[in-house]
A protein has these predicted regions:
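Substrate-binding cleft and catalytic face of glycoside hydrolase catalytic domains
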Residues: 1-102
């Protein structure tokens, strides 16, 4: 699913954007029967944390890739499944503004 072929590092490949969105849909739905509502999810998982200890992470993709992923895959998947969960962007490593490509 990622460019590294691993849970560690690597970015989600464009051909897997829909699969990635559906993974999050299914995860969110799995919590609901237990009375747990997921309010927020994030596109990235600590992309600059701990590569030396094989910490699962998803690397940054460009802002334009994020926009495409959201527009074409995440928003439609959430809407089709009537999810009200919000999607966070760039919610990690706030001190590293250089990691962000302006839209």
């Amino acid at each position: 699913m990622t460019s590294s072929g691993s849970l560690v590092a690597g970015a989600v490949l464009p051909e897997n954007y829909a699969r990635h969105a559906n993974y999050h849909v299914k995860t969110i739905q799995a919590y609901e029967p237990h009375g747990l509502h997921v309010n927020y999810v994030s596109l990235n998982n600590e992309p600059t944390c701990c590569p030396s200890i094989n910490y699962p992470s998803i690397l940054l993709i460009t802002s334009s890739q994020m926009a495409t992923m959201l527009k074409d895959d995440w928003f439609p998947a959430f809407k089709a499944n009537h999810l009200t969960t919000k999607i966070l962007l760039l919610d990690f490593n706030w001190g590293n503004a250089d990691l962000v490509e302006p839209l």
